[in-house]
Design a protein with these regions (language model features):
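N-terminal positively charged helical leader segments and presequences
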Residues: 1-85
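Glycine-biased, small-residue-rich flexible motifs in mid-sequence functional cores and linkers
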Residues: 7, 62-369
Length: 369
């Protein structure tokens, strides 16, 4: 019932419960609801609920195995509970426990470049291997790549939906949604039979940021909805991270805008983990599903890049000149080699090769800067 009351928030429900001691009194406390400035539409619905809609909701919830969590339940996500306008109810398919895990939102363009898509997947995989749950919005582009990156390494991922849980949007992501449910959770504040609508997605975004200790924007235009998520994260007192890109790419301008406004510039996994005060993962932890270059046999392109790097630090431009590869290819390969522990990012935009002896001792100290 609470999910269908327009404009009702967790703050309203908690305040009323504190005043009366009864969750059920919501329907019988018209005066209190007015005093708490609950919207008239919500008051009217609570006074005269649509019983047929509620019965249909209940039937679907029971048949689908959905868990319903109210803001009064211990299972309600603690970080989300701290935010203004948090939803009074969450519908969950999958692991309820995942909602209480340490989460990082990874978001960005629905139409990313190949480099942006690769960065989303690789960063999500590395962050998941570091113990973070990857939270995103199941949208095309960066969202989907982020979910897949976490799934690749057996990590936990949460999809916050802008529809009811009975409607996967976009429909092409039905299989991805099933994988997320099996390895994490699908959640929504919207009751069953809620169709996709433009006004739903900014509301979804506040939950994505509210669940998370920080938000990483991988790639975004200046009009991207992911900038809404970043703004909400900042307003909620959470960290905001952004990956820079080409000055000529419209898909990078949103990230550059965030960096100018104070977002943490991200070039490596360590940039995120150090800001969140999370230790770097131990060397040798890798995906069992997505092979990295050092596993079994290294692709010739990676061998050429490592040969070009040698054992003296070099800049990206120097490596492009030595290999003859495109800037996007070299940047993507360096990221993968860095995540695999073969290369270290140094101050000043330089890269250094890590030897087997280095790996046995520890990660390169500059990774911790």
């Amino acid at each position: 019932m609470l999910a269908r009351a327009p404009g009702l928030t967790a703050d309203h429900v908690r305040a009323l419960f504190a005043a009366t001691g009864e969750e059920s009194s919501l329907c019988d406390s018209a005066q209190l609801l007015r005093e708490m400035r609950v919207p008239a539409a919500a008051r009217n619905f609570l006074a005269s609920p649509d019983e047929s809609a509620l019965s249909a909701d209940l039937r679907w919830i029971e048949s689908s195995g959905t868990t319903v969590i109210s803001c009064l339940d211990a299972a309600y996500p603690p970080l989300l509970a701290q935010t203004d306008g948090a939803p009074p109810v969450l519908f969950v398919l999958g692991s309820v426990e995942a909602l209480g895990s340490t989460q990082l939102a990874v978001v960005g363009s629905r139409n990313p470049t190949a480099s942006g898509r690769g960065n989303a997947r690789d960063f999500a995989a590395a962050l998941a291997r570091s113990g973070l749950t990857i939270t995103s919005g199941l949208a095309l582009g960066v969202d989907a790549a982020s979910h897949r990156g976490a799934l690749d390494v057996g990590g936990i991922t949460i999809a916050v939906m802008g529809t009811g849980l009975d409607t996967v949007y976009p429909a092409a992501h039905a299989e991805l949604a099933a994988c997320i449910r099996a390895q994490g959770a699908l959640i929504s504040e919207f009751p069953p039979r809620t169709a996709p609508a433009g006004c739903n997605f900014p509301r979804r975004n506040r939950i994505i940021s509210g669940l998370s200790c920080g938000t990483l924007v991988v790639e975004a235009t200046c009009r991207s909805g992911s900038l809404i998520t970043a703004r909400l994260a900042a307003e909620q007192g959470r960290e905001v991270f952004a990956i820079p890109g080409s000055i000529r790419s419209p898909q990078s301008r949103g990230c550059h805008k965030l960096i100018r406004e104070g977002a943490t510039l991200v070039e490596s996994l360590a940039d995120v983990l150090s800001e969140l005060q999370i230790p770097l993962p131990k060397q040798g932890v890798r995906s069992s599903m997505r092979p990295r270059p050092t596993e079994v046999a290294m692709d010739k392109g990676y061998e050429m890049l490592l040969d070009a790097l040698g054992f003296e630090p070099a800049t990206l431009d120097e490596l492009i000149e030595r290999t003859g590869l495109s800037s996007e290819s070299v940047a993507s390969m360096l990221l993968i080699l860095e995540l695999d522990g073969c290369v270290a990012a140094l101050p000043g935009g330089r890269y250094d090769r890590i030897t087997n002896d280095d790996r046995q001792r520890s990660r390169h100290p500059d990774l911790r800067i």
